[in-house]
Amino acid sequence: MDIKKLKLHHRLETNKLKTNKHYEEEVKLTQMVRAAGUAAKLGPEYLAKALEIIPQVFNKDLLVGYEHSDDAAVYRINSETALILTLDFFTPVVDDPYLFGLISATNSLSDVYAMGGKPLVAMNIVCFPACKDVGILAQILKGGFDKVQESGAILVGGHSVDDNEPKYGLSVCGIVHPGRVLSNSAAKVGDVLVLTKPLGTGIINTGIKAGIVGQQTVDEVVKIMTHLNKYAALAFDDIRVNSATDVTGFGFLGHTMEMARGSDVTIEITVAQIPFIAETEELAKSGIIPAGAYRNRDFVKNDVRMEGIADHISDILYDPQTAGGLLVSVPENDAKALVAKMLAYGSLDARIVGRVIPKADKYVIVR
């Protein structure tokens, strides 16, 4: 199925489910949880402390572990094949169960694309209150199934837990050539940074939970969160990039800092080049900021220098993203071609937002 047909299939499925819910109980999923999406994740500083007592594992075939907080593990099977192993799950960011399934699966699959691979097999991770209409859960699972189908992988079951707070996601196994693995620790001086989705999903989702976001913006953020990074990553087959990650729970600056620290470089960010979702700036100015943004700030603030950046813009840069875009480090001479290829393959956005320079006093400088 080509890209146009996949997009049409997605629209038809979404419209069909909006008119035929297949469950009786009225439910607002976002009202059943304390925090939505990646904003519900434990903060990076808290996690780092928890992992201090866990020794790093070394193996000649473990190409990527967790030493650089990378997006997934990569294990070499032979000279031609390596497996990408990842999982992700979170609480609802929308009230529609089917859309929640689509969004969560999109987010879970993203790590495989960030590592330069293709997903093969996925399994469901489900937490759901058994007292609720089973049709609601069925629609969540249907959304996940449809998005996995779009990715080209297959969904083969999973595991569930009875839980008052609904949560959904996937464990995913992907494949990549050992010589084509991408990591978040290989950015080179002279590279530029390309971002493939606008920022603001955490702030917008917080506004949605509060009922203060317009429908047009709701539709836009759902479109962004259900768009697979598969399409941007197709360009990696044509143009070799040095480093990549996806922008998710640790926010744009959190993931940028991890790339800079892992690569032992400094990354300069040009704020004027970064796209924001509609209403994001207005909500940030009004203080509609998820708690995760403050946790992200606390974790990386000593490694980031802001130069004349307004407070509300800073908040957006720390905002935890749900199913965010790819952040790619590519040689400057190849950057325009990469952007053009990404857009041609169907990426929602792709633009140059920064550059890699020799290591300075901070890992990230924002201007």
Curated annotation (Swiss-Prot):
Mg(2+) binds at residues 71, 111, 246. This is Selenide, water dikinase 1. Keywords: ATP-binding, Kinase, Magnesium, Metal-binding, Nucleotide-binding, Selenium, Selenocysteine, Transferase. It comes from Peptoclostridium acidaminophilum. InterPro entries: PurM-like_C_dom, PurM-like_C_sf, PurM-like_N, PurM-like_N_sf, SelD_I, SPS/SelD. Belongs to the selenophosphate synthase 1 family. Class I subfamily. The record marks 41 as: Important for catalytic activity. Gene3D superfamilies: PurM-like C-terminal domain, PurM-like, N-terminal domain. GO terms for biological process: selenocysteine biosynthetic process. Binds 1 Mg(2+) ion per monomer.
